[in-house]
Regions:
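Short Cys/His-rich metal-coordination motifs, predominantly Zn2+-binding knuckles/fingers
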Residues: 19, 37
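Conserved GNAT acetyl-CoA-binding A-motif
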Residues: 136-149
Length: 202
């Protein structure tokens, strides 16, 4: 959700690797390090599986905390996460992350993708993304695609590290929808929807 020109979400999206502080979007900053000093948390004993009926409340909660609702506007239409193909990462009874997908234009579209801050940097996001790619392959879909707002540099980096390439930029789409450019990650104005694609099946 965007209010008063800034992205308003009920919980921080990122965790500071220096002091462990949970960071709202506008307060987060990026830094460059060598691979040896890239912060990594302890390995988690999680599993990735298809969501079950009993996961509904946990899915609603992570959607609410990540974006404030379960209906997501992406790729020019509105998707309902609760009606999507949902994969969850869990450790015991705790939900660590969610990737929600839907078939769109003959490809598998990532509708919602979120990992709780305390579980980031521990392989959860990568495992969810690979599971989604596996889902696309099992359905003989040609590709998996995702969309990122121009301000979300960490997610843009993450997707490209996982074999996605930029295929289209809907310039000004997000700003036009709101009537102004909201303030997102690290204070960057939110204007464009960057669409990425990763081939799955030949």
């Amino acid at each position: 959700m965007i209010e008063n020109g800034e992205v308003e979400v009920p919980y921080p999206h990122y965790l500071c690797p220096v002091d462990g502080k949970e960071l709202p979007l506008a307060e987060a900053r990026m830094s460059v390090t060598c691979a040896e000093h890239q912060p990594r948390g302890a390995v988690l004993g999680f599993t990735v599986r298809e969501a079950k009926a009993g996961d509904r409340h946990a899915i609603e909660e992570i959607c609410d905390r990540a974006w404030g609702e379960t209906e997501i506007d992406v790729f020019g239409r509105t998707f309902d996460v609760l009606a999507g193909d949902n994969l969850v990462a869990v450790e015991g009874d705790e939900l660590l992350g969610l990737i929600s997908c839907a078939v769109h234009g003959g490809e598998l579209a990532v509708v919602m993708y979120s990992v709780y801050p305390h579980a980031q940097g521990r392989g959860v996001g990568s495992a969810l993304l690979e599971a989604a790619a596996g889902l696309a392959a099992s359905r003989s879909l040609t590709a998996i695609k995702a969309a990122v707002s121009n301000d979300d540099l960490p997610l843009l980096y993450f997707y490209q590290r996982h074999a996605f390439s930029i295929g289209e930029i809907a310039t000004g789409l997000l700003a036009d929808k709101l009537g102004y450019a909201g303030v997102g990650f690290a204070g960057i104005p939110i204007r464009d929807e960057i669409r990425l694609r990763r081939p799955v099946c030949p």
